Amino acid sequence: MRLTRPALLLLLLTGLLLFFALGNHHLQGSTESRVAGIAMQMQVSGDWVTPSLLNEPFLEKPPLSLWLDAMAINLFGGELWAVRLASALAGLTCVMLLYAMLRRMGRPVALAWTAAAMLATMASFWDNARQVGEDALLTLGVTLALLAFYQASRHARLSLGSWLLFAAGIAIATLSKGVLGLALPGVVIFVYLLCQSLIDKRLVLRDWLRPALFTLLGLIPLLIWLCVLYQRGGLHAVGEVLWTNSVGRFSGSFVEAGHYEPFYYYLRKLPESFLPWNLLTYLGLWHFRKHLRNNPYLLFFCVWLVAQFVLLNIASSKRIVYLMALTPAAAVIAAEYAGVVLTWLRAHSQRSAVAKFLSDYHRPLALAVLIGVVAAYLGAALWAPRADRAESFQPVAAQVIRLQAEGKQVALLKPDERLGAVVFYSQQLQHTLDSTAQLQAFLVASPDHIAVVEDPVIPGLPLKVVDRVSVGRHHYYFVSLATLDPGQ
């Protein structure tokens, strides 16, 4: 892509949105604490094959985002912005990719720029592209795979460059989220090819074989990691990645994973999905429904949105963040419908003063809306540290670090994933305990031993609460062994 003036402006706008005040707040919530903790443990331990959280293998997802986070820590140190860098770069790449591919598909500069800007300013996309996690990378992989597939499918001849980009997208998506990274682009491609076959009333075998063959190519990086993981952890480790944490989450058999919601969960979330452009997206879907048979371009993006939405509704495990992979399609549909609205306004400008005003001044009005949205996001970025008190587990880590600096030995009893923040902030591995017996042995060994527990009352084990740190609804107690009065 040539760096034209519109492209440069889009790059600067998206860069400002995604990188402004990226490290001004602590790790917030369980996801950031968990992922940052795993990345730091990977960097400290030197084990880049088996992701581990608080000394236990953590095989919920493949390690691409963890590798990138650990590399950023290695390059820039344990900075908050460093562990968010991979997500922000993935978001920036996704926006620029959408603009470039829409231009290659022959869409006007104004429309391509509008769609990309809508993506960059879509609330769910902006928020997740500024967090530690793998969802921005998943979205980048899915977007690259689907846009490259559509570009390649427009030509009967083999377009090797586009198909290699497709394989790269599959590699990124599957190394980020495993089976889900294959299912999200896969369901779109299947439904789109099925619709095209029904519309054309013929089955073109090469249209089905090419994505299948290049999907196999894209799976090679994941398979290499799984082979190395098998050598380390055996079939159980591979099964945990591919079956327990993928099929189990989809079917609901993996109960411990949580996030199980009723089938209508995402329907309830529609009013807040794809804000602030969701109304344009939904009206666009309705408006374009009659044009899909004769317009493969619109058909593809509508299928992208609807097919993935249906798939996510079928899955037992549901989270609003999973809709991030749909945002590029939502942005394109919203931008296309905005063009339809502008055309309608121009057609009615002779009969309506309002239509004439909106038509004549649509550029400054659109610019004003964009400036307002961007200003709101920048304000939210500056406001983010205010959520630390209820969302950040840094105070727990700070207390652990303080005690260790005083010569105390601290251990964590059955720590949950939120205490991954302790590993990140301390930049060292932590001692963990798995049972009450281990806790008792640890505390008896020395009066300088302190444990972090969530419940300070353990039958048969007298504990003295040294300190308590609360984060939202979570309470962590720093305890030592109580000294009993000899006279009692």
Question: Over which residues does each language-model region extend?
Answer:
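Membrane-integral, polyisoprenol-dependent glycosyltransferases
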Residues: M1-R346, W383-R386, V423, V466-V479
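Generic N-terminal initiation segments characterized by hydrophobic and/or small/turn-forming residues
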Residues: L219-I220, F309, A355, P364-L367, ...
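Exposed alpha-helical structural elements
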Residues: H236-A237, S246, A353, P395, ...
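Cytosolic juxtamembrane regulatory segments of multi-pass membrane proteins
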Residues: F254-A257, S359, G407-L413
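Signature aromatic-anchored transmembrane alpha helix within multi-pass, membrane-resident enzymes
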Residues: G339-G379
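Short periplasmic/luminal acceptor-recognition loop of GT-C membrane glycosyltransferases, typified by
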Residues: G372-L481
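Short, charged/polar, Gly/Pro-enriched secondary-structure boundary elements
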Residues: L484-Q488
